[in-house]
């Protein structure tokens, strides 16, 4: 994966959790969010299984010293669901669920 990143070649997105070997292969996760996940201690997609997306979001806010856009939480929700075996879905499919579950951030 490091060779792909350094060469500027994008990682293909995984269709299934079992095929996901690098954070950048997660649907909806690009280099910036992959770096954010690494910053909070997530280095491999499998580490997202059974994680609390809100805790990841809050950890990233603390690590950066800035409030992250709520769509980051939507994206973390999508990634955790995907690694739990769900089909890939766009992050914005989680916006209504996030608002209902967590209210205003």
Indicate residue ranges for each PLM-predicted region:
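C-terminal extensions
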Residues: 1-27, 31-105
């Amino acid at each position: 994966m490091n060779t792909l990143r350094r060469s500027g070649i994008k990682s293909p997105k995984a269709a299934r959790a079992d095929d996901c070997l690098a954070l950048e292969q997660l649907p909806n996760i690009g280099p910036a969010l992959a770096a954010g996940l690494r910053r909070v201690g997530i280095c491999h997609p499998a580490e997202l299984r059974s994680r609390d997306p809100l805790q990841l979001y809050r950890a990233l806010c603390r690590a950066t010293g800035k409030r992250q856009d709520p769509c980051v939480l939507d994206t973390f929700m999508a990634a955790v669901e995907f690694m739990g075996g769900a089909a890939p879905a766009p992050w914005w499919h989680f916006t209504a669920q996030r608002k209902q579950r967590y209210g205003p951030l």
